[in-house]
């Protein structure tokens, strides 16, 4: 008599610059984890994003992400993009995660604005083979199921938090507080390491 196969792990992959990571990222990941019953959400800070010229050092962004996610047992952080040389592309991220989790069902979590541009991403045809895609929207966003670029993209509305990393950096640069916009430990990390002191 054969024993039934163990169910496949369901793993979310949330890539981002996380410069800095903020509460909007965490709420989105938590909502997706709950709605899709994911076993784990892996946060993957990008190394050198292909669409951005200047970002804070990867080690700082990695450590802020570790601090921000530490309290949630379903959240982990991967260094695959930080440690890989060269420009970061989603296809490389998913190939690396697939190598370390060969039997898992992967769900790549991204914003609705990014998903509308996905057809221009590197090796887009292979992306659909590596993972399902989850497009996170906020109430009032005009993206609908009919506007999705591929059948294997799921639309999920999450609570609206009008927070952006760009605004957080600018606030720090102007001497304004970012308490309650980013996790407390990240606020302290930014202060300790004098990040974002010049307006960006």
UniProtKB/Swiss-Prot annotation:
A Gene Ontology biological process noted in the UniProt record is: NAD biosynthetic process
Keyword vocabulary terms for this entry: ATP-binding, NAD, Nucleotide-binding, Nucleotidyltransferase, Pyridine nucleotide biosynthesis, Transferase
Q: Which domain of life is it from?
A: Bacteria
What InterPro entries does the record point to? Cyt_trans-like, NadD/NMNAT, Rossmann-like_a/b/a_fold
Reactions it catalyzes? nicotinate beta-D-ribonucleotide + ATP + H(+) = deamido-NAD(+) + diphosphate
Which pathway is this protein engaged in?
Cofactor biosynthesis; NAD(+) biosynthesis; deamido-NAD(+) from nicotinate D-ribonucleotide: step 1/1
Q: Name one GO molecular function term.
A: nicotinate-nucleotide adenylyltransferase activity
Give a single Pfam family match: CTP_transf_like
Name the EC number(s): 2.7.7.18
HAMAP family noted in UniProt: NaMN_adenylyltr
Tell me which family the UniProt entry assigns to this protein.
Belongs to the NadD family.
What is the role of this chain?
A: Catalyzes the reversible adenylation of nicotinate mononucleotide (NaMN) to nicotinic acid adenine dinucleotide (NaAD).
NCBIfam families per record: cyt_tran_rel (TIGR00125), nicotinate (nicotinamide) nucleotide adenylyltransferase (TIGR00482), PRK00071.1-3 (NF000840)
This protein's name: Probable nicotinate-nucleotide adenylyltransferase
């Amino acid at each position: 008599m054969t024993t039934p196969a163990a169910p496949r792990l369901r793993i979310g992959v949330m890539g981002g610059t996380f410069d800095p990571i903020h509460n909007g990222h965490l709420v989105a990941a938590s909502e997706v984890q709950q709605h899709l019953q994911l076993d784990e959400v892996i946060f993957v800070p990008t190394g050198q994003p292909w669409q951005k010229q200047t970002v804070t050092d990867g080690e700082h962004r990695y450590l802020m992400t570790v601090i921000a996610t530490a309290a949630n047992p379903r959240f982990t952080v991967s260094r695959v993009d930080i440690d890989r040389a060269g420009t970061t592309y989603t296809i490389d991220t998913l190939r690396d995660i697939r190598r370390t989790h060969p039997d898992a069902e992967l769900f790549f979590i991204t914003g609705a604005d990014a998903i509308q541009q996905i057809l221009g991403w590197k090796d887009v045809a292979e992306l659909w083979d590596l993972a399902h895609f989850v497009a996170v929207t906020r109430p009032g966003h005009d993206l609908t199921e009919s506007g999705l670029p591929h059948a294997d993209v799921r639309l999920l509305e999450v609570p609206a938090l009008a927070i952006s990393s760009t605004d957080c950096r600018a606030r720090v640069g102007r001497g304004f507080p970012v308490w309650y916009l980013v996790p407390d430990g990240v606020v302290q990390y930014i202060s300790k390491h004098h990040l974002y002191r010049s307006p960006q």
